[in-house]
């Protein structure tokens, strides 16, 4: 996935009201841009950190740009635009780059399922039946160990999705929790039990119920993203 237009570099001044960020561009222009991430962005929003943003030419937009990438304190690039994860996964699915999920005959997005009124990011159809996928974008890396973690904030919705997937698996339906690790240099991913122990517990219970837990790491550059390789998940 290449960015639709060249990204512009800047420095973060502050993030506020969840969806707003003030930045200073490389040319000294101060802008308020859209922050497309509802998480805490723990290692992605240090004051003064390097950021990259896409600028919109749409005169109807209230904000002139969207925050796309951050440089973490460890010098890694993280894609903070969570909407990119689903697009990246879909691109990889259609290209056959996720071997464990290859061979489907149809793909649908945002499919309702479950007793808790969830919507699966993807439903794949195979000759043997359906498969449901929940995608999570991972950008959190605590230190120099190259182990990414999810979530970066307490997520009741994430735990609900795991319960829904586990219920499917118990019925004999293939269910997949897929972590799209949008953090350069990541070598593995784990649940962030120190942030949300309930989520970690739900993930391990889902795996025991038969949910397939997969992680794929992206190559993150200022030109684009590519889902490059499978990463181990440390439960």
UniProtKB/Swiss-Prot annotation:
GO MF terms, alphabetically ordered: DNA binding
Pfam families: SfsA, SfsA_N
HAMAP family: SfsA
Family: Belongs to the SfsA family.
Protein name: Sugar fermentation stimulation protein homolog
Taxonomy of the source species: Bacteria, Pseudomonadati, Pseudomonadota, Gammaproteobacteria, Pseudomonadales
